[in-house]
């Protein structure tokens, strides 16, 4: 029977077995290995010559002859010894190579893990710095049982000059509104005409096609201002089908946009908790209003064109100067509670405004005193959108469960309720400039005749939730946007 040596891989002349590892070796090679290392070459346990057991096979044989150092057999013996040395060295090198490979693999894994940790820590550090930059020291002063005003160092309060400016603008707007209310515009769309509304244009390349869709809309004339999940704000001429300007700077989705009457200034509110004021002439950010500590959900421009209201998930509303970028006051809708404010809108006269919140309550606020003037608790789900009629008498509110309510601000009561069968959130509400029609954006687009509170037309052209609805001049067209990435124009 022949045995193979565990060191050389050749047939053994004098096979022995190691009591430590159980492997078979040629006695000549293993004795030399023990003399040099004192261990078993396979298990690396301590090994002596006494622990080697000879293996014998059946049959007879003669012992090898002794050779002298001057004969050819002697030379062959020397060559054999050299071969043995090479085999031992080769075996040792193979073991060292295997160990080196294992150590290298371990080091590479450690390096990869270290790189991942460094990358994660860098991201966390960047996020922490951004969060720190948004924090502002503030103290809260209790004003009354209904409201808490945040008196931060950056908030100047409503000065006498600001209040005088707002009151003067309110008086002029009230006089103009009374004059307009005597006669409706000759070109105002009729109910039967609006019933024939059809899609005349669909624009799908305004925002990123890879990140649907459009979340906010405002229009002035033939210009639309839209905000999207792609974090950008776009000024678009939908008649010429031309992008006029793209504004980039927010790092989260856009929740609300306002196009200033000057058609040059654009304002956007984002889930990154910032409000940005943009210049359409060079796409630059003229001011960043950093007053909230949570996503800004809605904004509304004062009729003076200089101030803006903002609502946030941090349970506060704020009044800010868009020229300086400074917050003038910041008020909690419910002191001691974290109630997200989903919607906010100025009354046409600019001295009162409404908020809709997650507690399903609509509140009317007096801006001068920052106090609640009235509360409407009729909804059963969070109020997602609100809109004042241009005549100043009515307020429309839409909730998460698909209900639209019309409130009389003179009698402080609910006049009408319109319930959608789909029970889907009402994302947008908008009156036309005369207050005759109300546009609703939910799972589809709907137009109601306010006086009769009846549906004039229902449009299901969008394939996703409708996030913005605006009437064109004299209600002769309707512009809408949706999470399906499209801006659509309807006319008759």
Curated annotation (Swiss-Prot):
Q: Where are the WD repeats?
A: 207-246, 249-288, 291-330, 336-375, 378-417, 461-491
This chain belongs to the protein called Pre-mRNA-processing factor 19
Enzyme Commission numbers on file: 2.3.2.27
Q: Which domain of life is it from?
A: Eukaryota
Q: Keyword Zinc, does the record have it?
A: no
Where would I find the U-box domain in this sequence?
1-72
Q: What class of enzyme is it?
A: transferase
Q: What happens when the gene is disrupted?
A: Enhances sterility conferred by rnp-4 disruption. Combined with emb-4 knockdown, leads to accumulation and leakage of unspliced ama-1 and tra-2 to the cytoplasm, severe growth retardation and arrest in larval stages, and loss of interaction of rnp-4 with pre-mRNA and spliceosomal U snRNAs.
Annotated family: Belongs to the WD repeat PRP19 family.
Instruction: Give yes or no: UniProt keyword Nucleus.
Output: yes
Main localization category: nucleus
- Show the InterPro entries listed in the entry: G-protein_beta_WD-40_rep (IPR020472), Pre-mRNA_splic_Prp19_cc (IPR013915), Prp19 (IPR038959), RING-Ubox_PRP19 (IPR055340), Ubox_domain (IPR003613), WD40/YVTN_repeat-like_dom_sf (IPR015943), WD40_repeat_CS (IPR019775), WD40_repeat_dom_sf (IPR036322)
Q: Name one Pfam family in it.
A: WD40_Prp19
Any one GO MF term held by the record is: ubiquitin-protein transferase activity
SMART domains recorded: Ubox (SM00504), WD40 (SM00320)
GO cellular component: a single term: cytoplasm
Q: Which UniProt keywords apply?
A: Developmental protein, Differentiation, DNA damage, DNA repair, mRNA processing, mRNA splicing, Nucleus, Repeat, Spliceosome, Transferase, Ubl conjugation pathway, WD repeat
Query: Which pathway does it serve?
Result: Protein modification; protein ubiquitination
Self-association state and partner proteins as the record states: Homotetramer. Component of the NTC complex (or PRP19-associated complex) which is associated with the spliceosome.
The job of this chain, per UniProt, is described as: Probable ubiquitin-protein ligase which is mainly involved pre-mRNA splicing and DNA repair. Core component of the NTC/Nineteen complex which is part of the spliceosome and participates in its assembly, its remodeling and is required for its activity. Together with emb-4, necessary for interaction of rnp-4, a probable exon junction complex component, with mRNAs and spliceosomal snRNAs. Plays a role in nuclear retention of unspliced mRNAs.
This chain is encoded by the gene named prp-19
Where's it found, cell-wise? Nucleus; Nucleus, Nucleoplasm
According to its UniProt entry, one GO biological process term is:
protein K63-linked ubiquitination
For this protein, what reaction is catalysed? Answer: S-ubiquitinyl-[E2 ubiquitin-conjugating enzyme]-L-cysteine + [acceptor protein]-L-lysine = [E2 ubiquitin-conjugating enzyme]-L-cysteine + N(6)-ubiquitinyl-[acceptor protein]-L-lysine
């Amino acid at each position: 029977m022949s045995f193979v040596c565990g060191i050389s891989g050749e047939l053994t002349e004098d096979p022995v077995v190691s009591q430590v590892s159980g492997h078979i070796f040629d006695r000549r090679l293993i004795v030399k290995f023990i003399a040099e290392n004192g261990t078993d070459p396979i298990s690396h346990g301590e090994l002596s010559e006494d622990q080697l057991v000879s293996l014998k096979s059946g049959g007879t044989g003669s012992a090898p002859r002794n050779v002298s150092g001057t004969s050819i057999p002697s030379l062959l013996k020397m060559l054999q010894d050299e071969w043995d040395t090479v085999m031992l060295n080769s075996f040792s090198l193979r073991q060292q190579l295997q160990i080196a490979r294992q150590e290298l693999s371990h080091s590479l894994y450690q390096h990869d893990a270290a790189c991942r940790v460094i990358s994660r820590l860098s991201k966390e550090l960047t996020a922490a710095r951004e969060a720190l930059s948004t924090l502002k020291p503030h103290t809260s002063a209790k004003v009354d049982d209904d409201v808490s005003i945040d008196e931060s160092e950056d908030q100047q309060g409503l000065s006498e000059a600001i209040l005088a400016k707002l009151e003067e603008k309110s008086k002029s707007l009230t006089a103009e509104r009374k004059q307009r209310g005597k006669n409706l515009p000759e070109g105002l769309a009729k109910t039967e005409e609006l019933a024939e509304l059809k899609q005349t244009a669909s624009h799908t390349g305004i925002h990123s096609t890879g990140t649907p869709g459009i979340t906010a809309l405002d229009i002035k004339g033939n210009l639309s201002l839209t905000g999207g999940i792609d974090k950008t704000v776009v000024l678009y001429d939908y008649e010429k089908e031309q992008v006029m300007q793209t504004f980039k700077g927010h790092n989260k989705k856009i929740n609300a946009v306002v196009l200033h009457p000057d058609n040059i200034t654009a304002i956007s509110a984002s889930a990154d908790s910032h409000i940005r004021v943009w210049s359409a002439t060079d796409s630059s950010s003229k001011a960043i209003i950093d007053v909230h500590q949570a996503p800004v959900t809605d904004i509304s421009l004062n009729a003076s064109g200089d101030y803006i209201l903002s609502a946030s998930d941090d349970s506060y509303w704020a009044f800010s100067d868009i020229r300086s970028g400074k917050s003038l006051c910041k008020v909690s809708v419910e002191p001691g509670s974290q109630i997200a404010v989903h919607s906010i809108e100025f009354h046409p006269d600019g001295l009162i405004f409404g908020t809709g919140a997650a507690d399903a309550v609509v509140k009317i606020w007096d801006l001068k005193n920052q106090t609640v003037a009235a509360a409407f608790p009729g909804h059963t789900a969070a109020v997602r959108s609100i809109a004042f009629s241009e005549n100043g008498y009515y307020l429309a509110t839409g909730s998460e469960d698909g209900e639209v309510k019309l409130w009389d601000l003179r009698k402080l009561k609910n006049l009408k309720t319109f319930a959608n069968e789909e029970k889907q959130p009402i994302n947008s509400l908008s009156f036309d400039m005369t207050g005759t029609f109300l546009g609703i954006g939910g799972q589809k687009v709907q137009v109601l005749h306010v006086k009769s509170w009846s549906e004039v037309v229902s449009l299901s052209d969008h394939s996703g939730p409708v996030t913005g609805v605006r009437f064109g001049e004299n209600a002769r067209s309707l512009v809408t946007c949706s999470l399906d990435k499209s801006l659509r124009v309807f006319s008759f």
